[in-house]
Amino acid sequence: MTQKTTLVLLALAVITIFALVCVLLAGRSGDGGGLSQPLHCPSVLPSVQPRTHPSQSQPFADLSPEELTAVMSFLTKHLGPGLVDAAQARPSDNCVFSVELQLPAKAAALAHLDRGGPPPVREALAIIFFGGQPKPNVSELVVGPLPHPSYMRDVTVERHGGPLPYYRRPVLDREYQDIEEMIFHRELPQASGLLHHCCFYKHQGQNLLTMTTAPRGLQSGDRATWFGLYYNLSGAGFYPHPIGLELLIDHKALDPALWTIQKVFYQGRYYESLTQLEDQFEAGLVNVVLVPNNGTGGSWSLKSSVPPGPAPPLQFHPQGPRFSVQGSQVSSSLWAFSFGLGAFSGPRIFDIRFQGERVAYEISVQEAIALYGGNSPASMSTCYVDGSFGIGKYSTPLIRGVDCPYLATYVDWHFLLESQAPKTLRDAFCVFEQNQGLPLRRHHSDFYSHYFGGVVGTVLVVRSVSTLLNYDYIWDMVFHPNGAIEVKFHATGYISSAFFFGAGEKFGNRVGAHTLGTVHTHSAHFKVDLDVAGLKNWAWAEDMAFVPTIVPWQPEYQMQRLQVTRKLLETEEEAAFPLGGATPRYLYLASNHSNKWGHRRGYRIQILSFAGKPLPQESPIEKAFTWGRYHLAVTQRKEEEPSSSSIFNQNDPWTPTVNFTDFISNETIAGEDLVAWVTAGFLHIPHAEDIPNTVTAGNSVGFFLRPYNFFDEDPSFHSADSIYFREGQDATACEVNPLACLSQTATCAPEIPAFSHGGFAYRDN
C-alpha cells in the first residue's frame, strides 16, 4: 500500500468518526452535553379536560380563612370587650375555643343537590368558654349567614337540654402550660434531692417533661389529672422513657394559684406530697431505681443507622391524572364526592356518587378511644377520648413520598382553634390514584376455551393523618372501580409506657430496662349514612345454615345442605349487634327497587376488625362511649343525632353529654332514612418490635361498603382498564392489549416537584 493510499484511508476514517460523533451529539441537549430530557408526562388528562365538578357540593366545604375571620370579627363585636384570646386565656376568662362549619340539614342540602333549590345557608358553629361569668359555662353558638354574618343563635339548651357545666370543657393549651409551670417551678424543687439522685435533675426540670392522662378524676365535677414524667429527649420520642414519677394535679379552681397536688406516685409507692417523698428519700426510706437518660441514639431514634439506598418504587400517571381536585371536591370518571375535616371528629366525606348515582350522603369518623391498663395510677386510669383533644385539630402535614405517594395531590386545611385568627395546615389531605398491584378480578382459562380476562386493580384514595399525643392514626377513604368503598385506619407512632416495677408483666411486655409497654385497645366509630337508590331503606341480615336433608336421588341417605338464611331487621334493637356477639356475615341496607334479577338493590357493610373486649358496663366511665358496646348498629337518621360522641364526654364521662345508647330507642327502621354506626378496633399488647415505634403492618382495621345486587352485573365490566385476549390473538399488539402499548404511552418522565414540608409549629403561624 502506498503512502498516498494510506493517507486517503486515514482521512476517510477521520471523516467517518467525525460523522458518527455528530450523529451521537445530535441526540444530546445543548445544555452542556447532558442526555436529552425525555418527554414529560401531561399534568392533566387531555380527554377529560376540563373536568366538571358538581357545584352543589359546596355546602360541605370547610370554612375558608375569609369566613373564619368574618365569624371571629362578629363574635368579638357582639360578645363584648371581655373576650380574651384563647391562646392566653386563663380558666376565669371568656374566650372563643373553636369555630368550624355548621353542617347543613340533610333535607335542605338534598333540596339543593337533587331538586335545584337554593343552597343551604352557610353557618358556623362556635364554642365559647364563659369562665368570666358569675356561673361559668360553655355555650354553643350558630353564626350566619356566611360570608357576612348578621346573627348568632345560642343552641346549647336546644342541643344538650341545658347549659354545659364548665368543668366539662376540653383543656386549653394555656391550661397545660400553667400546669407545667406549676409542676416545674413550684412543685418539683421540693424533691430536688431525689430527682438529682435518680434522674439527672436540672434546674426547673429542663430535662423532664409531662404527659397528660384522662379522664380527670373519679366523678362529675372533678378536674384532677394524673401526669407522668418522662425524660425530654430532643429529636426522639419521650414516650418510652418514664422516670417512675406521676403526679395527681387538681386544676379545677379558676385561679391557677389554687391548684394543688393531691397525690404522688413514685416507682411503685404512693405519697401525699413531693415534700413527703423527699423527706422519706433523705431518711433512706425510698428504694430508688436509677433510670439512665438514654439519649437519642440506638433503637430509640427514628433516624436510620444506614445510609439511603436506591430510590423506592414510584407511581406516576403516564397520560396525566385520571381525577381532579377542586377545593373540597374530587371527581373521576367513576366517583364524585366532597371531603372535609371536622376539627374534633376528624375526616368526613359527603354526597358520594358512583357513576353519577348517590350511594351515600355521609361517611365520617365520629370518635376514637384508646383504653389502657397498668399498675401505675396514670396507666391504669387512662382512657383517651380523642375527639375531645381534636382528631382534626391534631392532624399533621403529610410528608410527600412517606405518608402518601410522592406525586399525590395535596390539599391544605384552614381552621380557627384556640386563636383569634385562622391558621392553615399545609398538606392536610392527600388524594391519589394507586395501582394496587393486585387485579380487581381475573381469570386465565386453559379448559375448553383459551383466554385471559382481567381488570387492573386501581383505587382512588383520600387520606389524612392525626397525631394524638403518642399515636398517629392514618385515615383512609378508598374508592374501588366496582362501586365499593373501603374505610380504614392504621395505627402507628409511639406506644405509651409506664415505669416497670412489680407485677408489670400482667399489663404488657417489658420493652426497655425500666419500661413497660402497657396493654391497650384502639377503637374508632364511624357514621355511615347510606342512601341506597333513595332515602327509604331496609336493613337485611343474611347468613348460612346447614340443614339435614334426605338425598333426593337416594332417600336412604342424608346430607347436610348449605343454604342461605334471610331476615328483615325491623327495629333499632334488632339491628344493634353487641361487640363479641353473633353478627350476621351479610348485613346490607336495601331499597324497595329491584335489579334486573328481582333482588332489592343493596349495599353490604362488611367490617374488618379484631377489637378487644368492650369496657364492662359496670365501669362508671363506660357511658361516655357506649357506642363501643356495638359492632354495628342501624338507626333512624335524625338531625338531632348528628354524632355518636361529644368533645365534652372526656372530662365528664360520668354524666356524658352524648350517650349513644339513647339513639337505639327501638323505633322502626323499615322504609326509613337509615344510618349505620360501625365500630372497628384492635387489641395491642406492646412488644419489643414496637420500639422505636409501632408499624402499620397488621395494625389496620375498618370496613367495606360493597354493592349487593345494587347493579345487574359488576360495573367494572365496563372498565377502560380491562384486559382481554384469546388464543390465536397477538397479545403483544396494541389493538388487542392496551398493556402492550406501554412502551409507547408510558415513555414520559413525571414532573417531580421539589420536596416540601408543611412545618412543625403550624399552630403558632
Curated annotation (Swiss-Prot):
Binding site for Cu(2+): H520, H522, H684
Residues bearing the modification 2',4',5'-topaquinone: Y471
Entry's localization field: Cell membrane
EC category: oxidoreductase
Listed SUPFAM superfamilies: Amine oxidase catalytic domain, Amine oxidase N-terminal region
Cofactor note: Binds 1 copper ion per subunit. Binds 2 calcium ions per subunit.
Glycosylation sites recorded in the entry for this protein: N137, N232, N294, N592, N659, N666
Keywords attached to this entry: Calcium, Cell adhesion, Cell membrane, Copper, Disulfide bond, Glycoprotein, Membrane, Metal-binding, Oxidoreductase, Signal-anchor, TPQ, Transmembrane, Transmembrane helix
GO process terms (BP): amine metabolic process; cell adhesion
UniProt GO MF annotations: calcium ion binding; copper ion binding; identical protein binding; primary methylamine oxidase activity; protein heterodimerization activity; quinone binding
Residue numbers annotated as active site: D386 (proton acceptor), Y471 (schiff-base intermediate with substrate)
Residues noted as binding Ca(2+) 1 in the record, renumbered to the chain: D529, L530, D531, D673, L674
PROSITE patterns with a match to the protein in the record: COPPER_AMINE_OXID_1, COPPER_AMINE_OXID_2
InterPro entries to which the protein is assigned, alphabetical: Cu_Am_Ox_Cu-bd, Cu_Am_ox_TPQ-bd, Cu_amine_oxidase, Cu_amine_oxidase_C, Cu_amine_oxidase_C_sf, Cu_amine_oxidase_N-reg, Cu_amine_oxidase_N2, Cu_amine_oxidase_N3
GO cellular component, one term: microvillus
Enzyme Commission number(s) from the entry: 1.4.3.21
Catalytic activity reported: methylamine + O2 + H2O = formaldehyde + H2O2 + NH4(+); benzylamine + O2 + H2O = benzaldehyde + H2O2 + NH4(+); 2-phenylethylamine + O2 + H2O = 2-phenylacetaldehyde + H2O2 + NH4(+)
Pfam families in UniProt: Cu_amine_oxid (PF01179), Cu_amine_oxidN2 (PF02727), Cu_amine_oxidN3 (PF02728)
Function: Catalyzes the oxidative deamination of primary amines to the corresponding aldehydes with the concomitant production of hydrogen peroxide and ammonia. Has a preference for the primary monoamines methylamine and benzylamine. Could also act on 2-phenylethylamine but much less efficiently. At endothelial cells surface can also function as a cell adhesion protein that participates in lymphocyte extravasation and recirculation by mediating the binding of lymphocytes to peripheral lymph node vascular endothelial cells in an L-selectin-independent fashion.
Family of the protein in this entry: Belongs to the copper/topaquinone oxidase family.
Name recorded for this polypeptide: Amine oxidase [copper-containing] 3
Originating species: Mus musculus
Native organism taxonomy: Eukaryota, Metazoa, Chordata, Craniata, Vertebrata
